[in-house]
C-alpha cells in the first residue's frame, strides 16, 4: 500500500477543494445552461426577410449591449444608404456615455444610478455630441486585454464618484480625474487617426464616413399609464439622460417592426431576457403557454426542441410585468429580418452581441408574442414608419 506524506495529503486536499470550487463556479452553471443541449432541435426556419448587417460581435464582460446594438444598427444604416460599412468603436461610444452619466450623477449630488448599461439613444447622443471612431482606431482593449472586461473599472469609477459628491466644495477638475481613470483601463482616445489613407477626427469621421443624421431617428416605447402617440420620459434605471420616447399601443410594436423590415430598415431593440422562454443556448425566445412550475419533466426537457404553443399577452399583463419589475431593461439586440418556422409561425431574426456560440452563430429567432410582451423600446429611422403613425406622433 502506498503511503502519502503529510504534505502530499495537504496538496491533494487543496487540489480537490479547488476543483470542487471550480466545478460549482463554472461546471454547474454550464450544465444548467446546457440542460437541453443533447436533445436535437426540430425547428426548421425559412427566411422571409434578411437585411444587411455587419458580423456578430462579442461584448465580453461588459454591460455594453446597448452600444453594440446601437452601433450595429448604424452600420446597417450605412449599408441601407449604399455606403461601405465600417465597424464603429463600441467602447468609444460607451466611454463618452459614461462621462455624460457621471456628469449627471454629480449634478444630482449622487442621486442617479450608476452602471455600465444604457439606452439606444445614448449611441445617437454620443454621435451628435462627440462623433464616432472606427474600431481600428479605438478598441478600448488596453495592455494585454483581448476582450472587454469592466469588472475592475466600473467599481473603481463608481467609488471615485461617490467620494467626489461627498466633497464640498466640488473639485473643479474632477472630470480630468475621471477621464484619467478611463484612460488607465481603456486607453487614451486619439485626437486624430488615419482611416483608409485619410486623416480624421471623431467628428469628421462621423460626418463624412458614417454620414447618418441623429435627428432622422425615433425612439418608441409602450406603456398604458401615459397618453398614446405622445412623448414621455421612460423611467428605467438606464435612461440616465431622461430622454423621451413616443408611446405606442402594444399591438403596434410588431406592426411597426414588420413595416420597417418590409421597407428595408432594421430596428434596434431593448428587451428583457430574464424570462424562462428566452434561451441564448438554443437561439430562441417565445412566451410559453405554461410557467415552469406547471410543466411536466418532459415539457421542460422539450421547451426549446420544437415549436410550442404560446400564451397570448394583453396590454394589462405587459404593463403589470413592467411595474412589478418582472420586465426590466436588461438587454439590447438588433432586429434584422423575419423568418417562418415549419408551421408558418413568424419569428424575428435578431442579431445578438454575445459571440457566435449558439446554434445560429450569434443570431436568435424571437416570436412576435415575446416582442409584444418584453419590449422596452425600439429605435428606428422615421421613414420606416407608416404615414399614419408618423402623423400621430407628429414627426
Please describe what each predicted stretch is.
Residues 20-34:
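Membrane-interface motif at the C-terminal end of an N-terminal transmembrane signal
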Residues 2-17:
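N-terminal Sec-pathway targeting helices
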Residues 26-27, 176-395:
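Active-site signature of cysteine proteases
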Residues 40-268, 353, 358-360:
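Active-site nucleophile-adjacent alpha helix/oxyanion-hole segment immediately C-terminal to the catalytic cysteine
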Residues 1-4, 34, 166-172:
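Generic structural signal for short, solvent-exposed loop/turn connectors between secondary structure elements
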Residues 32-42:
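Acidic, low-complexity proline/glycine-rich segments
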Amino acid at each position: 500500500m502506498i503511503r502519502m506524506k503529510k504534505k502530499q495529503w495537504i496538496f491533494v486536499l487543496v487540489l480537490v477543494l479547488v476543483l470542487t470550487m471550480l466545478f460549482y463556479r463554472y461546471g454547474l452553471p454550464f450544465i444548467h445552461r446546457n440542460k437541453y443541449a443533447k436533445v436535437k432541435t426540430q425547428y426548421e426556419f425559412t427566411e422571409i426577410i434578411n437585411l444587411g448587417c455587419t458580423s456578430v460581435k462579442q461584448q465580453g464582460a461588459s454591460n455594453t449591449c446597448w452600444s453594440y446594438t446601437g452601433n450595429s444598427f448604424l452600420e446597417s444604416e450605412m449599408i441601407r444608404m449604399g455606403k461601405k460599412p465600417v465597424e464603429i468603436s463600441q467602447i468609444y461610444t460607451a466611454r463618452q456615455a459614461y462621462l455624460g452619466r457621471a456628469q449627471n450623477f454629480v449634478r444630482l449630488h449622487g442621486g442617479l444610478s450608476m452602471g455600465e448599461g444604457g439606452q439606444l439613444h445614448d449611441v445617437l447622443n454620443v454621435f451628435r455630441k462627440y462623433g464616432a471612431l472606427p474600431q481600428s482606431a479605438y478598441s478600448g482593449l488596453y495592455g494585454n486585454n483581448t476582450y472587454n472586461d469592466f469588472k475592475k473599472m466600473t467599481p473603481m469609477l463608481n467609488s471615485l464618484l461617490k467620494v467626489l459628491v461627498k466633497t464640498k466644495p466640488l473639485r473643479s477638475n474632477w472630470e480630468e480625474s475621471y477621464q484619467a481613470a478611463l484612460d488607465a483601463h481603456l486607453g487614451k482616445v486619439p485626437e486624430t487617426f488615419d482611416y483608409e489613407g485619410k486623416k480624421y477626427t471623431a467628428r469628421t469621421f462621423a460626418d463624412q464616413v458614417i454620414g447618418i443624421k441623429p435627428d432622422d431617428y425615433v425612439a418608441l416605447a409602450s406603456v398604458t399609464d401615459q397618453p398614446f402617440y405622445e412623448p414621455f420620459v421612460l423611467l428605467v434605471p438606464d435612461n440616465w439622460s431622461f430622454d423621451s420616447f413616443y408611446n405606442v399601443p402594444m399591438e403596434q410594436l410588431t406592426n411597426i417592426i414588420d413595416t420597417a423590415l418590409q421597407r428595408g430598415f432594421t430596428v434596434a431593440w431593448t428587451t428583457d431576457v430574464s424570462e424562462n422562454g428566452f434561451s441564448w443556448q438554443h437561439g430562441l425566445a417565445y412566451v410559453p403557454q405554461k410557467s415552469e412550475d406547471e410543466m411536466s419533466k418532459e415539457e421542460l426537457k422539450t421547451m426549446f426542441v420544437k415549436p410550442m404553443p404560446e400564451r397570448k399577452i394583453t396590454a394589462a399583463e405587459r404593463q403589470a410585468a413592467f411595474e412589478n419589475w418582472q420586465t426590466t431593461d436588461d438587454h439590447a439586440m438588433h432586429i434584422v429580418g423575419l423568418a417562418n418556422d415549419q408551421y408558418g409561425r413568424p419569428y424575428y431574426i435578431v442579431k445578438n452581441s454575445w459571440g457566435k456560440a449558439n446554434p445560429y452563430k450569434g443570431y436568435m429567432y424571437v416570436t412576435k408574442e415575446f416582442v409584444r410582451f418584453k419590449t422596452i423600446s425600439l429605435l428606428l429611422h422615421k421613414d420606416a414608419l407608416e404615414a399614419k403613425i408618423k402623423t400621430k406622433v407628429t414627426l
